[in-house]
């Protein structure tokens, strides 16, 4: 399964072990740059938008309208996608005053401080791309930018009682601020690849890979 992985200065936070596990369960990882490529690579079966610093490159990401359109069209066609933290921000309507992909509602804004910082346990309220209802995985949040809407498919719980809804998730999407390590629950990686196999959506088949 060909999984497009955003890798550039804006999207650079990945657990290498998590990428290795995706390879182990059948993924071919295809790097691309939302900053400089004009469209998604051809023939993708899934998409992984990791964390990073999209707020520092918001103007450049926004100016690359062809890539924004390519990503949105792929997601609207049902391409399975994981978007963590910075990747989630990229899918919203805007980062600050800079329009983004616009697949998810709401804008991202500078909170002026760390927002919901620390380790949490994510528990799914509904079946989704990565697990069934009740499935859980350790995760963490570390970000100074927040979003007007952050989703409610999962509940994030701190070790000492505080909890909140988070993450937009469907049968083909996980998009939210929490980062997780696939080895904390390898079934999440297996389920993601299964969705990619079942979907066999091929995004950007009429496009040329920018690399």
Residue locations for each model-derived region?
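Glycine-rich, charged/polar anion/phosphate-binding loops
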Residues: 31-36, 89, 123-128, 160-163
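Catalytic beta-strand/loop cores that center a nucleophilic Ser/Cys/Thr
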Residues: 127-171
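A glycine-centered loop/beta-turn motif at secondary-structure junctions
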Residues: 165-195
